[in-house]
Amino acid sequence: MSGPSSWRRAATVMLAAGWTHSSPAGFRLLLLQRSQNQRFIPGAHVFPGGVLDAADSSPDWVRLFAPRHTPPRFGLGPEPPRQPPFPGLSHGDADPAALPDDVALRICAIRETFEEAGVLLLRPRDADPASQEPSQALSPPAGLAEWRSRVRSDPRCFLQLCAHLDCTPDIWALHDWGGWLTPYGRITRRFDTTFLLCCLRDTPRVEPDLAEVVGYQWLSPSEATECFLSKEIWLAPPQFYEIRRLDNFASLSALYRFCSDRPLEGGEKWLPIILLTSDGTIHLLPGDELYVKDSDFLEKNMSTDKKTEEIVKEGKVLNRVVIHSPYVYEIYMTLPSENKHVYPRNYVVNKRCTAHL
């Protein structure tokens, strides 16, 4: 049994980049294909990211950010309100010398993006982080493969790389978006993952590490959904939900404005509760009428003898993902937006796997 103390903290960044190949207004998301040898969701297409390392919160970063950016916020602005933790979930007391979570998790996401995809979300140390337009990734340095190997072996080397390039992690380009806790189920490795979003003017060059990551695609939200339905890629429910949420935005500029206008709102972190029906699975999310915020559901599921269709028809207040099969998900949403965020629109699939919004 995996109690709260065994959960691993992680960060992931949804990279949305301008796409001039078809439409100047559109954007594409970077999805990395995980190796089949990975223990956690092998073969899935995911956003770049990984587990928080002690090196990400090391006070040694303070010297690199100085003198332009100083503790405790390093220019990120006022701290957003903290969401009450899920009952029974705690990570213990933080090291008082460590960087704040907001900073450390951003460094983690940036480091992992470099390790997995070879993309450097860095900014020259003397650059002003204030910007009215999306950021740009740094051109890959000479000796990319050697540096990446060093960082993979020892995350502390990422600080050395940044110092070598006279850059800092571009923490200001990463916006709070939300977060997901791995639900109780067959997956024994569970993560407390912060989701961040970064808008880039152009698609950077991507070089998969060919270890954890064996391929990648730049896809719009609608293209990613179509590829999932046609079994070209596989998405875990959180990635599917977030991709459908991003489908609310018609352009990169609209997405960037949205993120820039809500910096003080922060992001909600959700623990899905799994409801096992007689013929399927439903992931219940906060706000749904069947959702129960109780520590018991850190280590158990709900179950019913009813069919999925019955449960769906009975519902009035909904925030749920219905899992019909590994490649057929539906989203049911009736909640108004909160915290100046957006929810995905209803997404229903007919028997021929044609989606209806």
Swiss-Prot record:
The record marks 34, 40, 189 as: Important for coenzyme A binding. Coiled coil: none annotated. Mg(2+) binds at residues 112, 116. Keywords: Hydrolase, Magnesium, Manganese, Metal-binding, Peroxisome. Monomer. It comes from Mus caroli. It is found in: Peroxisome. One of its GO terms (biological process) is succinyl-CoA catabolic process. One of its GO terms (molecular function) is magnesium ion binding. Residues 10-242 form the Nudix hydrolase domain. Residues 78-87 have a biased composition (Pro residues). This is Acyl-coenzyme A diphosphatase NUDT19. One of its GO terms (cellular component) is peroxisome. The modification N6-succinyllysine is found at residue 300. It catalyses: an acyl-CoA + H2O = an acyl-4'-phosphopantetheine + adenosine 3',5'-bisphosphate + 2 H(+); CoA + H2O = (R)-4'-phosphopantetheine + adenosine 3',5'-bisphosphate + 2 H(+); hexanoyl-CoA + H2O = hexanoyl-4'-phosphopantetheine + adenosine 3',5'-bisphosphate + 2 H(+); octanoyl-CoA + H2O = S-octanoyl-4'-phosphopantetheine + adenosine 3',5'-bisphosphate + 2 H(+). A motif (Microbody targeting signal) lies at residues 355-357. Belongs to the Nudix hydrolase family. PANTHER family: ACYL-COENZYME A DIPHOSPHATASE NUDT19, TESTOSTERONE-REGULATED PROTEIN RP2. Fatty acyl-coenzyme A (CoA) diphosphatase that hydrolyzes fatty acyl-CoA to yield acyl-4'-phosphopantetheine and adenosine 3',5'-bisphosphate. Mediates the hydrolysis of a wide range of CoA esters, including choloyl-CoA and branched-chain fatty-acyl-CoA esters and at low substrate concentrations medium and long-chain fatty-acyl-CoA esters are the primary substrates. Highest activity seen with medium-chain acyl-CoA esters and higher rates of activity seen with the unsaturated acyl-CoA esters compared with the saturated esters. Exhibits decapping activity towards dpCoA-capped RNAs in vitro. The keyword Magnesium applies. Residues 72-94 are annotated as: Disordered. Its EC number is 3.6.1.-, 3.6.1.77. Its cofactor is Mg(2+); Mn(2+). InterPro entries: NUDIX_hydrolase-like_dom_sf (IPR015797), NUDIX_hydrolase_dom (IPR000086), NUDT19 (IPR039121).
